[in-house]
Every structure is written in structure tokens, then in C-alpha cells.
Amino acid sequence: MLNIIWLITGILLLFAIMIHNPKSQGFGTQNQIFGSTRSAEQTLNKATWFLILLFFILTVVLSINNEF
């Protein structure tokens, strides 16, 4: 079960990183999905950091489980 969550987290993390604009304008400038550009960038940054932390935590947990 954790393997599936880890895989989905990795895919979502790749997607979140790919939609970041290198000029720090973000996803919201192209499509006003979140209402404002600043809000879109903040939401995307928070989601990306959450996915990074979740991915690393799951990696450590799965690594520990496979050792024993």
C-alpha cells in the first residue's frame, strides 16, 4: 500500500515541478485557475513542498521496512 502512495506522490511531484515557470511567474499566469497569480504561486509552492516532504518520508519508511 505504501508503495502505491509513494509512486503516486512521485508522479504528482514531477507534475508539480514541471508546471513551475522558470521565471517565477508560475502556472497561474497562463491560466487564471486560482484567481490571482500570487495566490497560484503560493498554492503551487505549498503543494510542491508538501509532496517533497511526503516523498522523502515515504522513501525512508519504505527503506527501513525493506531492511528488516
Swiss-Prot record:
It is found in: Plastid, Chloroplast thylakoid membrane. It holds the Pfam family SecG. Coiled coil: none annotated. GO terms for biological process: protein secretion. Its main location: plastid. It is a multi-pass membrane protein. The chain crosses the membrane at residues 1-21, 44-64. InterPro entries: SecG. It comes from the Eukaryota. Keywords: Chloroplast, Membrane, Plastid, Protein transport, Thylakoid, Translocation, Transmembrane, Transmembrane helix, Transport. One of its GO terms (cellular component) is chloroplast thylakoid membrane. One of its GO terms (molecular function) is protein-transporting ATPase activity. Involved in protein export. Participates in an early event of protein translocation across the chloroplast thylakoid membrane (Potential). Belongs to the SecG family. This is Probable protein-export membrane protein secG. It comes from Guillardia theta (Cryptophyte).
